[in-house]
């Protein structure tokens, strides 16, 4: 039970740090953006894409709940990936660069490598850029209609559960040695 608490604490701290960093960036950019003008409105339009190629503008408030849920799951996914790599790789520097390279390459590859476009909706790093997913931009770029908020939440949730199980297994194996 002690090990479970320790792993969950590490994951929650990683998620908290990620969410805090995101909030800090949003607060700073919102503050800087409001200098000389008003703060803005939740009715501000965002360009959305659909499979037919017809674009529409929708208010940002329509995306807020999905964006918050996907952002939290994305931060937890990033924390889980880093935690798994930190258990596998002993050195902090190699863990940092491996995590950075893995997450960047997978996120970039989801929209650039054409042969995987048909399965890109099953890759969790597709959903790390929540706003592009919610606006339909990634689905439009990859011509994959399965990329949406619901699929993203399910994929990120399943991957987080699997990575948490892997974390527990790796910690148990490490404890046995």
Locate each region found by the language model.
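Cytoplasmic juxtamembrane regions at transmembrane-helix boundaries
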Residues: 1, 79-103, 173-177
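Interfacial "coupling" helices/loops that link adjacent transmembrane helices in transporter permeases
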Residues: 1-9
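Secretory targeting signals
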Residues: 8-87, 130-150
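Residue-level recognition of pore/gate-forming positions within transmembrane alpha-helices
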Residues: 14, 100-104, 160
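Transmembrane helix-loop junctions in multipass membrane proteins, especially transporters and channels
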Residues: 26, 30-42, 91, 111, ...
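Alpha-helical transmembrane segments of multipass membrane proteins
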Residues: 27, 80-84, 104, 108, ...
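Alpha-helical transmembrane segments of multi-pass membrane transporters/translocases
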Residues: 74-75, 136-177
